[in-house]
Amino acid sequence: MKKIQNKLIELFNRYKHVWILSYFIIYLTWFGYLERTVTTHYHLIHLPIDDYIPFCEYFVIPYIMWFGYVAFGIAFTALHDKKEFYRLCAFLYTGMTVFLVISTLYPNGHNLRPYYFTHHNMFTALCEWLYSTDTPTNLFPSIHVYNSLGIHFAVMHSSYFKDKKHVQHASLVLCVLIILSTMFIKQHSVFDVSTAFMLAFVMYNVCLLYTSPSPRDGATSR
């Protein structure tokens, strides 16, 4: 019994930093409120270039893979690279909070989704399911895009993947596919994607400047 107790204490001390993941409770509660309340009387998001981007249902796959991609990045850094975990959370949480504030103060949405599908397959069925669970509101900056960039930055800066070019390349490919998917399945306007890139650029520099470990601290903390 004593050994089990000591083991639990050791695990708690080693991974006590994961408490900051409780932010997701705040985020999901706030986002859920916005999804329920921002249904009409919102500002329409649209750029002319949106009309030239065709609907392609196959991109629903990388769009859904985003959930696993983000979960992997957070879990891996939490377990193996505490300093990178803190930097990643600082990046993600700031952008997600900015998104919530914008959506609250400036309710927004789009009408880019197709009214009907000219053909049906498993991918259009997935799109139909996605449309039924996610309203076309609360759009910018796109969290799908912003968080994908954050995870890729974490992979590129993690000491664990420094010499694993295949992992870095796979992360880049998936990140790009996810970003494209937001537009090809008509979940986001180019405006949402562009604003996500702008915010990511700012936060990338801020996180590196203020939360990077100093050389004498070492690159990794377990």
List each model region and its residues.
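Hydrophobic transmembrane alpha-helices
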Residues: 152-157, 200-208
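Hydrophobic, membrane-inserted alpha-helices
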Residues: 69-73, 150-153, 174-179
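Conserved small/polar residues in nucleotide/adenosyl-binding loops
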Residues: 210-216
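Membrane-embedded alpha-helical segments of multi-pass membrane proteins
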Residues: 65-69, 146-147, 194-198
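Interfacial helix-loop-helix junctions of multi-pass membrane proteins
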Residues: 139, 178-201
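Membrane-interface loops
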Residues: 35-48, 78-166
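Aromatic-anchored segments of alpha-helical transmembrane domains
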Residues: 28-29, 96-102, 173-183
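N-terminal transmembrane-helix/juxtamembrane module of multi-pass inner/ER membrane proteins
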Residues: 2-70, 118, 127
